[in-house]
Amino acid sequence: LGPYTKKDVVDFFSDYGSRFLGKRVVVARDTPAFIGNRIGIFSIQSLFHRVKALKMTVEEVDKLTGPVIGRPKSATFRTVDVVGLDTLVHVANGIKEHCPDDERHEVFQLPSFIEDMMQQNRLGSKTGEGFYKKVKKEDGSSEILTLDLETLTYRSAKKAQFETLEKTKAISDVADRFKVLCDGTDKAGQFYRAVFGDLFAYVAQRIGEITDTVYKIDDAMKAGF
């Protein structure tokens, strides 16, 4: 939606998308990356920076950002492998270039380990290796190796365990579970507070810039992801 967009044009496409295509239509303002990618790329870039600061592993992050918070099993790093690291980097660089006045502009700067992975062509599924790598063992069976974010070498996967996760096993409601996760006193709780506190603050700052209300941001994220 730009300053010269006619209301009847918006109404027509909103109605057409909803009735004939069966899609949820979200009206966004004409800004770089619109709603979904602006918020989504900030979220994952913020996570990348936090992961390094907290010295967390790929397994730990995917354990904390998958079904336990109502997201798919692919969680964070497996999703990046499927989408392609180069795609993510392209969008992040575009936002960084075209949103110079963003108060969190520095978040869109790529962490060094992402730059190194790009240089080594570790783009994910399309190149056969990314944050995960499937290899054949001597006995003919397959093993999924995990990238060590400190050394950028592959190793056997390690089981991620957190006291906070244990406390949520009996909680079926995701909203109730999320409250317990964010109250955790271990590294998992610290991770949730840092990552989602950052995300929610950023979303609040985008209201009025990328769309009119926070509800439209919710709609775009739910429909798009």
Q: Where do the language-model regions lie?
A:
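N-terminal glycine-rich phosphate-binding loop for ADP-containing cofactors
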Residues: 1-225
